[in-house]
């Protein structure tokens, strides 16, 4: 039976790499798929991983009807055996509903990959709808690590190396951006709550100890 499967995890846990691997394995068996993505770090219409792998994809723009797009492709003779959706957290809830229709009405497997929560620990609307509708939810087994060595469970947005907790939910950035730019870092819950990034921890580590002042 076709399924809607949601592969979730923090940044840096290999979601896009797994998406590319699933596509490779299926294409090696003669199957043809459609890849959707939104706001990939490599640019519009690209699916990329941090390992340097990149492939062409269809940009799932806001307001785009994903189900209608596939019906149109298939009615023109296009062969579609499965669907891969990367950065699924950025999709609107109604687009997730369309993915469920693809599974139920077109009998296609849909593999969606995304981050569950944003930098404020709030669910992305797309991820929330996937949790509500998916036949299966898989947590990625490659664990991202906080700077302290603990398992990273939270995504932090940084500006100049400092963690911020206000702003637009979606700002495209990366974990490898220069410190002065908007970037992201994965943290354990403890250090996310304390707003302690690797940069702030390093600054604290090299700060000279303040000696107590005593009166003569």
Swiss-Prot record:
UniProt-listed Enzyme Commission number(s): 2.7.1.21
InterPro entries in the record: P-loop_NTPase, Thymidine_kinase
Compartmental location: Cytoplasm
Keyword Ligase: no
Catalytic activity as recorded in UniProt: thymidine + ATP = dTMP + ADP + H(+)
Residues that hold ATP according to the record: 9-16, 86-89
Statement: the UniProt record of this protein carries the keyword Endoplasmic reticulum: no
Catalytic residues identified in the record: 87
An individual GO BP term: DNA biosynthetic process
GO cellular component: cytosol
SUPFAM superfamilies: Glucocorticoid receptor-like (DNA-binding domain), P-loop containing nucleoside triphosphate hydrolases
Single GO MF annotation: thymidine kinase activity
Coiled-coil boundaries: none
Keyword vocabulary terms for this entry: ATP-binding, Cytoplasm, DNA synthesis, Kinase, Nucleotide-binding, Transferase
Oligomer status and interactors: Homotetramer.
Annotated family: Belongs to the thymidine kinase family.
UniProt protein name: Thymidine kinase
GN (gene name): tdk
């Amino acid at each position: 039976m076709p399924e809607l499967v949601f592969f979730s995890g923090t940044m840096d846990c290999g979601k896009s790499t797994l998406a590319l691997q699933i596509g490779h394995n299926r294409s090696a068996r003669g199957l043809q798929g459609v890849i959707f993505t939104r706001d990939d770090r490599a640019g519009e219409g690209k699916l990329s991983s941090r390992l340097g792998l990149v492939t062409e994809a269809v940009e799932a723009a806001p307001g785009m009807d994903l189900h209608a797009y596939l019906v149109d492709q298939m009615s023109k003779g296009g062969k579609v055996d499965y669907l891969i959706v990367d950065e699924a957290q950025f999709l609107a809830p109604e687009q997730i509903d369309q993915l469920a229709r693809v599974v139920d009405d077109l009998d296609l497997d849909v593999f969606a990959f995304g981050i569950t929560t944003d930098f404020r620990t709030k669910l992305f609307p797309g991820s929330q709808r996937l949790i509500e509708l998916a036949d299966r939810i898989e947590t990625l087994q490659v664990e991202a690590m906080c700077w302290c060595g603990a398992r990273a469970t939270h995504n932090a947005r940084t500006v100049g190396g400092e963690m911020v907790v206000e702003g637009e939910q979606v700002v495209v950035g990366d974990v490898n951006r220069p410190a002065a730019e908007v970037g992201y870092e994965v943290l354990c819950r403890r250090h996310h709550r304390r707003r302690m990034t690797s940069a702030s921890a390093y600054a604290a580590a090299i700060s000279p100890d303040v000696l107590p002042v005593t009166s003569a």
